[in-house]
């Protein structure tokens, strides 16, 4: 069995505005664990960018796990912060004692952070083998696909519903596609033309810029009369959240699934939210909608998304705009921070085999 090297590498946010690939010691392989060598790691342009900018609440406040409140005090994470990242794909290279369900050579996906290798629980990864026929590069989409599917479930989409999806980044585009597969008529909203084009390719019946005359709310009423059944907001922009509220019908549902930062001056809750009795539902990958009970959990989200990849009903290839060596991570985050309009899914390449594996 292959063993970890004497030196590993991990992406570290050294301070706000500074991110780099640094050396670290390989983790010790213990019973029930496996060592995974990373091939690819997808970069989040939302959560991880908040760590780069220093705006993530975990680096400014303390998360009280018992009260589930952010409170004043020592931040939960202090710079330098290493090991963030939640969209990894790699190969099992070593089995620890008592590890079962996996073999050396298995290709798996999961969460172990932007690092060259990791030691992960075998029982966790045994259910996360890359499905046959799925390009390993596309394995970076499992987590974001689960986030998108969770938002669609929160919207309670029914066959024939009219749904507006705000924000056509990676998660927004996947949500658009999943909503179409669920039987919804979808309108996609984004300020970048290329993203609107991708949304149309994913099945959106209408695509709108973010600031049409009269606002998106007026367009939604022209599109379906009386407003949409539901809207999903995935940009993390308060103005977009306000327009999502304006776009739905009386007593319609808005799913707030973006990672919102700072104050909410653009959110006017005394207007359509109040007078149309709009319901706002938060969607976050830490849990699935309560009304679904125990039937849906994180594992099922991953499994269902993987089934769509295997069937080819979701084709995420066009969403990958950048594949870069991990040691170029500083340039990657500078580009994301600048808001490059052509960038969607950036993938860090660690030790992927030549040509990948089909």
Language-model regions: role of each:
Residues 83, 111-124:
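A structural motif shared across PLP-dependent enzymes of the aminotransferase-like
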Residues 33, 40, 106-107, 117, ...:
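Residue-level marker of beta-strand positions
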Residues 27-42, 54-112:
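Glycine-rich beta-strand-centered segment in the early N-terminal region that forms part
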Residues 205-281:
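Glycine-rich cofactor phosphate-binding loops and adjacent beta1-alpha1 units
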Residues 135-212, 218-219:
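Mid-domain Rossmann-like dinucleotide-binding core that forms the NAD(H)/NADP(H) cofactor-binding site
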Residues 1-4, 245, 296-358:
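C-terminal hydrophobic helical "lid"/dimerization subdomain
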Residues 217-221, 225, 267-320, 331:
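C-terminal substrate-binding/catalytic core of Rossmann-like NAD(P)-dependent dehydrogenases/reductases
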């Amino acid at each position: 069995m292959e063993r970890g090297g004497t030196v590993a590498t991990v992406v570290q946010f050294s301070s706000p505005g500074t991110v780099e690939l640094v050396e670290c010691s390989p983790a010790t392989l213990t019973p029930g664990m496996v060592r995974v060598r990373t091939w690819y790691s997808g970069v989040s342009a939302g959560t991880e960018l908040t760590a780069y900018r220093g705006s993530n609440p975990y680096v400014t406040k303390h998360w009280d796990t018992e009260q589930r409140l952010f409170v004043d005090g020592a931040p939960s994470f202090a710079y330098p912060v290493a090991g963030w990242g939640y969209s990894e794909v790699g190969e099992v290279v070593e089995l620890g004692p008592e590890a079962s369900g996996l073999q050396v050579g298995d290709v798996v996906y999961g969460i172990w952070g932007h690092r060259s290798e990791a030691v992960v629980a075998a029982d966790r990864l045994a259910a996360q083998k890359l499905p046959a026929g799925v390009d390993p590069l596309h394995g970076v989409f499992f987590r974001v696909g689960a986030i998108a599917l969770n938002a669609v479930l929160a919207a309670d989409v029914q066959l024939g519903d009219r749904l507006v999806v705000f924000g056509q980044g990676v998660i927004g585009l996947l949500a658009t596609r999943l909503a179409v597969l669920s039987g919804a008529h979808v309108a996609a909203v984004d300020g970048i033309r290329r993203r609107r084009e991708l949304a149309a390719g994913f099945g959106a019946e209408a695509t709108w810029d973010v600031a049409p005359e009269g606002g998106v709310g007026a367009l939604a009423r022209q599109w379906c009369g009386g407003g949409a059944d539901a809207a999903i907001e995935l940009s993390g922009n308060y103005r977009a959240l306000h327009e999502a509220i304006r776009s739905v019908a009386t007593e319609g549902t808005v799913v707030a699934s973006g990672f919102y930062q700072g104050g909410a001056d653009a959110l006017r809750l005394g207007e359509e939210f109040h007078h149309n009795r709009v319901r706002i539902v938060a969607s976050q990958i830490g849990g699935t909608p309560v009304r679904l009970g125990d039937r849906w959990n994180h594992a099922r989200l991953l499994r269902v998304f993987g089934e769509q990849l295997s069937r080819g009903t979701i084709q995420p290839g066009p969403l990958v705009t950048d594949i870069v060596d991990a040691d170029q991570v500083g340039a990657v985050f500078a580009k994301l921070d600048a808001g490059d309009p052509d960038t969607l899914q950036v993938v860090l390449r660690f030790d992927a085999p030549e040509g990948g594996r089909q």
